[in-house]
Amino acid sequence: MIFLNTFARCLLTCFVLCSGTARSSDTNDTTPASAKHLQTTSLLTCMDNSQLTASFFDVKFYPDNNTVIFDIDATTTLNGNVTVKAELLTYGLKVLDKTFDLCSLGQVSLCPLSAGRIDVMSTQVIESSITKQFPGIAYTIPDLDAQVRVVAYAQNDTEFETPLACVQAILSNGKTVQTKYAAWPIAAISGVGVLTSGFVSVIGYSATAAHIASNSISLFIYFQNLAITAMMGVSRVPPIAAAWTQNFQWSMGIINTNFMQKIFDWYVQATNGVSNVVVANKDVLSISVQKRAISMASSSDYNFDTILDDSNLYTTSEKDPSNYSAKILVLRGIERVAYLANIELSNFFLTGIVFFLFFLFVVVVSLIFFKALLEVLTRARILKETSNFFQYRKNWGSIIKGTLFRLSIIAFPQVSLLAIWEFTQVNSPAIVVDAVVILLIITGLLVYGTIRVFIKGRESLRLYKNPAYLLYSDTYFLNKFGFLYVQFKADKFWWLLPLLSYAFLRSLFVAVLQNQGKAQAMIIFVIELAYFVCLCWIRPYLDKRTNVFNIAIHLVNLINAFFFLFFSNLFKQPAVVSSVMAVILFVLNAVFALFLLLFTIVTCTLALLHRNPDVRYQPMKDDRVSFIPKIQNDFDGKNKNDSELFELRKAVMDTNENEEEKMFRDDTFGKNLNANTNTARLFDDETSSSSFKQNSSPFDASEVTEQPVQPTSAVMGTGGSFLSPQYQRASSASRTNLAPNNTSTSSLMKPESSLYLGNSNKSYSHFNNNGSNENARNNNPYL
């Protein structure tokens, strides 16, 4: 009741001013911005043909000095004696309801009222006896969800059946959970997870690196999903939900820097586009950052959704300044996100894409600089040639290629949403071309990588009934494309396609259905539900812990989509339902984000401090380690058990196929030993420096000097012995004599593996314990 009196007095002052009988004076606001206050920045109309409308309405109440400061530009056609009915709605509940006759206030100018224009900037002091009764929590609770509605009736309308005017003001206290002190620590911790993964992989703890990398990427996916969900153009997003989700827009590249915004403005204008000026003029515009429900019963009361679509009073377009300068600008979805980030809508696409490209540039330059630093330290003999960084020095080129795929899959939701949305905006011809190019490049990289993974996996299934054999035995392929599939079980490598499809569909519908909030919310909920059910059913990730981690993330995503389904007002539920859901959304996501961040911090700390963090993880059940070329050390006579285990693994692989398939494979691979090296290949990486295809031959291991055999991969070791100067090849004659008579070229290639040696029945039979699965596991960051 207290603030109702304050608000009513402000409105009454407006009526007095337009009648010409009241005093008004321009006032300089000397109250600090951080002082306790309540404010409203727009006056919304909540009925057809309202006789009071406002194109600008800015009112602030400061309890410390009991002062109301207002700046109003409105028009009224009210005449005669009027009765006012005022309501205070807090979190969807009607907590106060007051009715009074303007004539009872004793102001001649208010009884009767006169039509006219209201254009005033002034102040008014409220009695302290009134302001002291207002609850103090209203000034401190973040993202206050409260609004005041005032309906005017003719004095003789005692039944309140025919309202003359209906206006509504959204209240705020300036406190919010949207803060850089939440956004940037979250971003920093997420980045630390990825950096820690790279570091521990270099020093040899591959299992730890794989799990940290997988969890870090899942963390990014969660943050991106939350940011994308917040971009849906639903009917009503309560303040606390809108503010909290704004903290994660950095994951979409939505980061405001003044100098870059100036560059983007210039670029838009220089390429025959028109820059938006809403943010630059927000102090003189009346803006509602989202549609608001206005009733405890339902948002359909007073036809509020229909009124906001009234083009005579409201506009949702930022492209016509002459339009929104005389009307109330209603922002929702991506428009709201851009406004809350203080980014002009015309710069939204460029902001997200440029920050992604900048991050990509920094990562690539850092990798090159690190390579140069290692070379300098090695040449200065500060770093040993055989240090843990040798594999990076030798394979830094392929590491950069793998990094491009890694960043592409992380940025795919961001790039696809921003590019497709830009197609609907056409801010300038050049920006549209930029959107096409960047979308084609990122999509092309992922499509290429996905096709390569599917070809390799299907070939391995056809030859060995096990996709892990070729996916993990070809170290060059693993190093380049491994990030696309190593987080999944070997037989679930195909889950890469559902994951990319899920990300693309979400981005597509959020981008193109900005003006269809109800349909958009329903489609996104169905997509989330379908993906969550499939994820729980198939459980494609590499182990139980990672599956639980990802299922929990997508469960929260599903709940968020469910909440936004209600925010779209599809069910016309009471406003209190949406308000309570918003509070639950904030608490749920805040607690869950805190858990994920603490989990990342603890995992990274243990990885850096634990003497051997790999012991915390169980071996992969798909036995992928067995198919990776092992490290062969000097023979010391302690190799009996290991050689028997090797022969057993080879025998197991042989029993996976029938006799006809085995003969076909033996004959085919034997042909390949003497095949022309110029055989055409579909892809350029079918032959690599790490491959054994043209160097494998059926000679006994005792015929050559024992040498360490290490795969040339940044994730597998320090290089194969066949590349070293001391490597002794079998003579050409020996290989020719042992090869089959039929030397025709075959399209099939020999898998890079120490388990198969062509047509010979002989195999390497001398291994010691240092060449066991543990060595391979410690030199592969994906395991």
Curated annotation (Swiss-Prot):
Residues 704-748, 756-767 have a biased composition (Polar residues). Keywords: Endoplasmic reticulum, Glycoprotein, Membrane, Signal, Transmembrane, Transmembrane helix, Transport. One of its GO terms (molecular function) is FAD transmembrane transporter activity. It is a multi-pass membrane protein. The chain crosses the membrane at residues 183-203, 212-232, 348-368, 403-423, 431-451, 493-513, 522-542, 548-568, 582-602. Residues 681-783 are annotated as: Disordered. Glycans are attached at N28, N65, N81, N156, N323. It comes from the Eukaryota. Residues 204-211, 369-402, 452-492, 543-547, 603-783 are cytoplasmic. Its main location: endoplasmic reticulum. GO terms for biological process: calcium ion homeostasis; cellular hypotonic response; FAD transport; fungal-type cell wall biogenesis; protein folding; sphingolipid biosynthetic process; transmembrane transport. Present with 414 molecules/cell in log phase SD medium. Belongs to the transient receptor potential (TRP) ion channel family. This is Flavin carrier protein 2.
